[in-house]
């Protein structure tokens, strides 16, 4: 069995959003030394869209001489049959699970197109999500410290420690209103909590990161700058972590964690409940 890394075309295909296909595909491919060239085809509901998809799968096979990987979810039987005739390896992301659930609960599935998160059916959920995203964007990177009473959580940390992507993920996936505030170089000489945070201590949560990883991230943004130097990163992290300990603020190290893992660990540590599923 091959162990060295290989490149492979990967298609995520659905007659819905294809988000489930992408999510499962990323998890599965993360177990292998594969460098995926990914293409997503959502809402494949017409012959025209399916024909274009089949052309791209065929082109991939002819160009590389190996079958691409296709993670898919298709409800319409005729379109599913046509898709499976293409030169590819296919992985139905729901079939085995749906069949098992059907057997366990003794009920036949009734699949429908785009069933999940319909705006008409779940309008309250939809608008809650939008409100959470808007609030989080308005409070990103210390832009605003107004309306902190509406925040579910306030993330603190040095610049580039993962606050913004974590905030947006928690807003989009969990419906949480997230504030994030960066401590910058000018804060290090007299590190303290802002007065605005004193009444919201129970919402504070810190993110930290290894100095080597932080240096690497900052070098990609501002190579050769003092901001990106390992010495500066070490100093900022030591100062901020000392603040977290002094003020009894819970924090985690994000160095080897994905955004999904960071967000889930925050929920676990704080006891926050998801508003959306």
Curated annotation (Swiss-Prot):
It is an enzyme of class 2 (transferase). Keywords: Kinase, Nucleotide-binding, Serine/threonine-protein kinase, Transferase. It comes from the Bacteria. Coiled coil: none annotated. Pfam families: Kinase-PPPase. InterPro entries: Kinase-pyrophosphorylase, PSRP. ADP binds at residues 157-164. Its EC number is 2.7.11.33, 2.7.4.28. GO terms for molecular function: ADP binding; ATP binding; phosphotransferase activity, phosphate group as acceptor; protein serine/threonine kinase activity. It catalyses: [pyruvate, water dikinase] + ADP = [pyruvate, water dikinase]-phosphate + AMP + H(+); [pyruvate, water dikinase]-phosphate + phosphate + H(+) = [pyruvate, water dikinase] + diphosphate. Belongs to the pyruvate, phosphate/water dikinase regulatory protein family. PSRP subfamily. Bifunctional serine/threonine kinase and phosphorylase involved in the regulation of the phosphoenolpyruvate synthase (PEPS) by catalyzing its phosphorylation/dephosphorylation. This is Putative phosphoenolpyruvate synthase regulatory protein.
